[in-house]
């Protein structure tokens, strides 16, 4: 059975994206589908620098669950037609080579779906999805092409 890795890039513990991610995680759990939810990506993950040798504990924990997951769902808010820096930073950390694994080994050929939630009409959400999809493809992820937008007024 599938194991699903869920990332929520919400900007606060109670953001709409985090609420949706938690709802989906609970739904999967009730259906007996193993899943691993990580949110608050802006906390405990320093910006990746060439001079930074220590891997954050949160990234080590994510790696452990990403290794055994075969699908990924990313919840991403949209700001100014793009996705947030803390999501890109987390993905960059996870893409690094480690312990004999090559660059993007954790991502290679895994299927990923993106769910976007915005306050308003979502006028620039499609472009943000396209930008994020391109970035995810760079990590060797297989991005579902369907665009999912949830608006909250």
Place the predicted regions along the sequence by residue.
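Residue-level recognition of beta-strand->loop/alpha-helix junctions
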Residues: 8, 39, 147-149
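N-terminal beta1-alpha1 ligand-phosphate binding loop
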Residues: 2-33
């Amino acid at each position: 059975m599938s194991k699903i890795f869920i990332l929520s890039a919400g900007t606060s513990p109670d953001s709409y994206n985090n609420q949706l991610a938690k709802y989906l995680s609970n739904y999967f759990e009730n259906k007996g589908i193993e899943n691993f939810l990580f949110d608050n990506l802006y906390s405990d993950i320093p910006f990746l620098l060439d001079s930074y040798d220590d891997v954050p504990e949160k990234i080590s924990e994510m790696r452990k669950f990403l290794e055994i997951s075969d699908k990924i769902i990313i919840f991403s808010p949209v700001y100014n037609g793009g996705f947030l820096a803390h999501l890109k930073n987390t993905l960059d950390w996870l893409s690094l080579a480690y312990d004999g694994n090559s660059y993007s080994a954790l991502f290679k050929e895994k299927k990923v779906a993106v769910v976007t939630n915005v306050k308003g009409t979502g006028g620039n959400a499609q472009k943000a999805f396209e930008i994020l999809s391109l970035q995810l493809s760079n990590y060797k992820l297989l991005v579902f092409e369907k665009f999912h937008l949830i608006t909250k007024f």
